[in-house]
Amino acid sequence: MPALPVIDIRSNHVEDSLPEQIIKGLTSQPKTLPPLLFYSNEGLEHWNHHSRQPDFYPRRQEIEILKQGGNDIARSIAPSSVILDLGSANLEKVGYLLEALEAQEKDVLYFALDISAPQLATTLKEIPSSNFRHVRFAGLHGTFEDGLRWINETPEIRDLPHCVLLLGLTIGNFSRQNAAAFLQNIANHALTGASKNKSSILLSLDSCKVPTKVTRAYTSDGVVPFALQALTYAKALLCDRIDNGIDEKVLSCNLRPEHWHYLSEWNFALGRHEASLIPRFGDVCLGSMLQDIIVKKEEKVRFACSYKYDAKERQKLFLDSGVDQGMVWTNEGCDVAIYELKLA
């Protein structure tokens, strides 16, 4: 079976800007690390293992919704749609939707977007494209912003109906203010054009605010190597910038995984889960490559947040984003739901 096509839509190379983002985050207060640092190929392998653990309810619930409601969700997608999947690291979940579209003989174009070229190739290789006649597949190598620009500006794409998939609770990784801005940006790029009345966003949100359930989900097996792998990746990126002939001993980079541990916390005031790295033994000097930044013992270097949305917060998110809620798909006892959103 021939390899599915991959289109490079990158406006710039993320790897080139990540070292600057690392330094900027570590010199800020509170200290942070950029989320993209955690999604190297090795990081994604650890995350995929972690997300399959029994206590990690978000993935399990989302799969149940797509498995049971796939036909109804597929019916909400217009014929001839361009489906842009902004979270395509694993197709197991969305596969139920694609199979439903095929069963309905609905001709659509599915584009899996990923920042990692190797991960994208792996994802596309797993698609049994020979089983599909009505759903056609391709990959997009780039960032969220690259994907939105592409769907808005590509002549043969921009006037077709669009369906943007934002599953995997991705919107929860943004602050509430930034989530509204990002969702509005998606709407402005993908829900406009000649077929805007037929275009939509399919968004998953988590409403669970039970601290024990949430923290148990984000401390299940696989999350620690996922978190610590980012330090190895950061060091590799920084060392790659060293010019030949420069003594590497002069330019030190102290990002040893064994010197750090992972912290999982529930923030009651903000209604979010917080994931951080903390020095294990004492103060850590990060070395000359990182401007000799000192991370104090017990000081948190935050790298991820997962916001949970109750009904009032969800309504405000949609209002601030300029979108209207249409259909909602969930199951009894589920904290996760998938929302159909249209331009207001």
Curated annotation (Swiss-Prot):
EC identifiers of the protein = 2.1.1.261
Q: In which pathway does it act?
A: Alkaloid biosynthesis; ergot alkaloid biosynthesis
Q: Which residues form a coiled coil?
A: none
UniProt keyword S-adenosyl-L-methionine present: yes
| Family matches, as Pfam families | Methyltransf_33
Keyword annotations for this protein? Alkaloid metabolism, Methyltransferase, S-adenosyl-L-methionine, Transferase
State the similarity comment: Belongs to the methyltransferase superfamily.
**Which NCBIfam families is this protein grouped with?**
methyl_EasF
User: What does this gene product do?
Assistant: 4-dimethylallyltryptophan N-methyltransferase; part of the gene cluster that mediates the biosynthesis of fungal ergot alkaloid. DmaW catalyzes the first step of ergot alkaloid biosynthesis by condensing dimethylallyl diphosphate (DMAP) and tryptophan to form 4-dimethylallyl-L-tryptophan. The second step is catalyzed by the methyltransferase easF that methylates 4-dimethylallyl-L-tryptophan in the presence of S-adenosyl-L-methionine, resulting in the formation of 4-dimethylallyl-L-abrine.
Q: From the Swiss-Prot or TrEMBL record, give the protein name.
A: 4-dimethylallyltryptophan N-methyltransferase easF
- The record lists the organism as Claviceps purpurea (strain 20.1) (Ergot fungus)
The UniProt gene name for this protein comes to easF
